[in-house]
């Protein structure tokens, strides 16, 4: 609770500092579309706890990376958490965690855009019928591969061995 209070105070300070900045009509429009930083922070903390409690294979650090990289960019994170917690659609969540893992490798490229992974994707993308939606988009392929790694590791290892090994390397280095 103490940590959350300090975090909330830090967010309030950040909001006050932002209020002193030049407020443009574009900035006002952007703020009106998004919850306040405090609301985001509380939602972010609660959601990460729900993800880790619901799916024990998601480490707190990966859940944190996932929420941080996807929450403000796309609605998939919010929708997939809702689907998993309320409806039990675990594959939607593992797919979104796969996107977060692909975004975690900031060594000149995300994991899914590393030159070696592009070669793996070109070689193996048509090997696995279960990953059909990932054929043409490298980010979708990576997310589908992570989902397969979690739910059907032996199928992925047989059909896409280089992808399987690459996912292991990404997890070890994230």
What is the role of each PLM region?
Residues 9, 23, 27-31, 66-73, ...:
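Extended hydrophobic/Leu-rich segments
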Residues 17-21:
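Boundary at the C-terminal end of the N-terminal hydrophobic targeting segment
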Residues 4-13:
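Sec-dependent N-terminal signal peptides
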Residues 23-48:
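Zn2+-dependent metallopeptidase catalytic core
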């Amino acid at each position: 609770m103490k940590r959350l209070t300090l975090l909330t105070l830090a967010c309030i300070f950040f909001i006050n500092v932002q209020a002193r900045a030049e407020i443009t009509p574009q900035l006002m429009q952007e703020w009106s579309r998004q919850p306040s930083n405090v609301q985001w922070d509380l939602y972010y903390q609660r959601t990460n706890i729900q993800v880790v409690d619901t799916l024990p294979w998601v480490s707190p650090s990966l859940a944190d990376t996932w929420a941080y990289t996807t929450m403000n960019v796309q609605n998939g994170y919010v929708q997939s958490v809702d689907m998993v917690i309320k409806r039990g659609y675990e594959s939607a969540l593992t797919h979104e965690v796969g996107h977060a893992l692909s975004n975690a490798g900031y060594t000149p490229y995300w994991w899914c855009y590393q030159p070696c992974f592009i070669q793996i994707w070109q070689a193996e993308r048509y090997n696995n019928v279960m990953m059909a939606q990932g054929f043409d988009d490298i980010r979708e392929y990576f997310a589908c591969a992570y989902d397969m790694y979690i739910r059907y590791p032996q199928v992925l290892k047989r059909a896409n061995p280089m992808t399987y090994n690459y996912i292991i390397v990404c997890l070890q280095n994230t």
